């Protein structure tokens, strides 16, 4: 055993043992108490210390019944009419202090026996939050261990998106970047991946099938690639998307054109293999919302009937779980139960939890982050922008550079932030029908203990990429 590993075991009071690549939990209570030290090593170290910390947590999680899982079977059960229509699965993008936020989420879940919820991170967020997939998954699994949660944990790659600009410059290089990210994520325990090639939809073409052609073909190519690399016994939940967030609402002809084209391509590339479990559609939202001059957000009007009508087509015609709503953090809370009423299978939430981070951190720390943005994100300041609009749009860029200082916040400040997040999770879980969904998860989800590969964790660091044109 290397000195490095011995030192890491000391940080958790020797509650784990390591022989070669085999990890055993010797004292679960002691490990739970000290796991936060490994989390900090995972997040802040830049060498093999980070890799080993992640590997130890992933391995211990399996032994403690915290199992990365795919939600595919549950979604297909909804498509068959076997799973109840009483809930919409929330998918949370935890950008800042992900471990602390996930702990709050697991606390909320345990109060009401919830199990059907997802932790996700987008390709763009991996860049500006400074969290590679293995680090993000480590934060989530460690949070589950800390809070005594047992069962399937759904970790998702959100918007594994093709950059239209980069694709036009070099199609194969851009596709390979998403393939590589998929491989990296699967190795880290991401068994749910949202493939997003909707950036390549061309609405200037004369017919809907022509507009969606490149989207469905590339979605199928990436899906076939994921199927080829998914672990034995695991069917990764793959989501597709028929349009980027923002402009015109999605239509049934678009959904049918995309799915029909996708299914034709999948038969060629991966005959007999499962396809999509869900589909993301446009209903009038935008990522992050529209910020007004005073820093407040414009009210969002969602076409809930689009979610309902297209969910029904997705289930009845294509066997999927239904439609997915992106950019929902800025939707009025009183409307959240409408996602359930209108049969959405999944809803994505990110911005509000980042807003709560900035609203709850000490004023001096926030001022320091904003001063950094003045210098390092000056290019994001558009003519006519107020300070409030600029900071709202640019502040996410400070999360990665200030990660270490975020971890170093006093315990009282971290507790205050955790309590605020927990109260919000409580509210959203109630509105989205999460009570007793652990029973539904246990009924339909098959868990497979996929042993992590040490070589996926202890290797050269992956350089960050320019993701400024990608969606969150």
Feature roles, as predicted:
Residues 1-157, 163-166, 170-174, 180, ...:
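Alpha/beta catalytic barrel-like cores
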């Amino acid at each position: 055993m290397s000195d490095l590993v011995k030192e890491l075991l000391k940080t958790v009071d020797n509650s784990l043992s390591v022989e070669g690549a085999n990890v055993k939990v010797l004292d679960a209570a002691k490990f739970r108490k000290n796991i936060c030290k490994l989390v900090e090593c995972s997040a802040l170290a830049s060498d093999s210390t980070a890799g080993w910390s992640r590997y130890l947590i992933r391995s211990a999680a399996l032994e403690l019944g915290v199992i990365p899982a795919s939600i595919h079977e549950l979604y297909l059960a909804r498509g068959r009419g076997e799973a109840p229509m009483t809930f919409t699965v929330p998918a949370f993008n935890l950008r800042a202090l992900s471990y602390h936020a996930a702990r709050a989420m697991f606390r909320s879940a345990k109060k009401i026996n919830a199990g059907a919820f997802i932790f996700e991170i987008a390709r763009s967020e991996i860049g500006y939050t400074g969290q590679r997939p293995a680090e993000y998954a480590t934060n989530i699994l460690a949070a589950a261990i800390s809070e005594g949660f047992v069962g399937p944990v759904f970790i998702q790659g959100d918007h594994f998106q093709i950059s239209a600009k980069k694709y036009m410059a070099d199609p194969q290089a851009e596709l390979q970047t998403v393939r590589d990210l998929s491989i990296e994520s699967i190795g880290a325990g991401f068994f749910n991946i949202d493939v997003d090639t909707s950036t390549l939809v061309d609405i200037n073409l004369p017919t809907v099938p022509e507009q969606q052609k490149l989207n469905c073909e590339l979605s199928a190519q990436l899906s076939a690639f994921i199927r080829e690399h998914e672990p034995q016994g695991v069917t990764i939940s793959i989501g597709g998307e028929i349009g980027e967030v923002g402009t015109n609402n999605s239509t049934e002809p678009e959904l049918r054109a995309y799915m029909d084209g996708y299914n034709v391509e999948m038969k060629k590339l991966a005959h007999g293999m499962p396809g999509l479990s869900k589909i993301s559609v446009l209903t009038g939202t935008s990522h992050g919302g529209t910020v007004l001059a005073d820093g407040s957000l414009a009210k969002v009007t969602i076409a809930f009937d689009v979610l309902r009508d297209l969910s029904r087509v997705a289930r009845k015609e294509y066997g999927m779980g239904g439609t997915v709503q992106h950019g929902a953090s800025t939707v009025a809370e009183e409307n959240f139960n409408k996602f359930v009423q209108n049969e959405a299978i999944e809803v994505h939430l990110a911005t509000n939890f980042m807003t709560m981070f900035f609203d709850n951190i000490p004023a001096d720390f926030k001022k320091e982050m904003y001063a950094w943005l003045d210098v390092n994100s000056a290019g994001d300041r558009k003519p006519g922008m107020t300070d409030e609009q600029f900071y709202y749009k640019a502040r996410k860029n400070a999360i990665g550079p200030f990660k270490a200082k975020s971890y170093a916040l006093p315990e009282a400040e971290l507790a205050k932030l955790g309590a605020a997040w927990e109260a919000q999770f409580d509210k959203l879980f109630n509105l989205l029908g999460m009570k007793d969904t652990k029973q539904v998860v246990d009924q339909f989800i098959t868990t497979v203990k996929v042993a992590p590969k040490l070589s996926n964790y202890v290797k050269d660091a992956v350089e960050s990429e320019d993701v400024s044109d990608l969606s969150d």
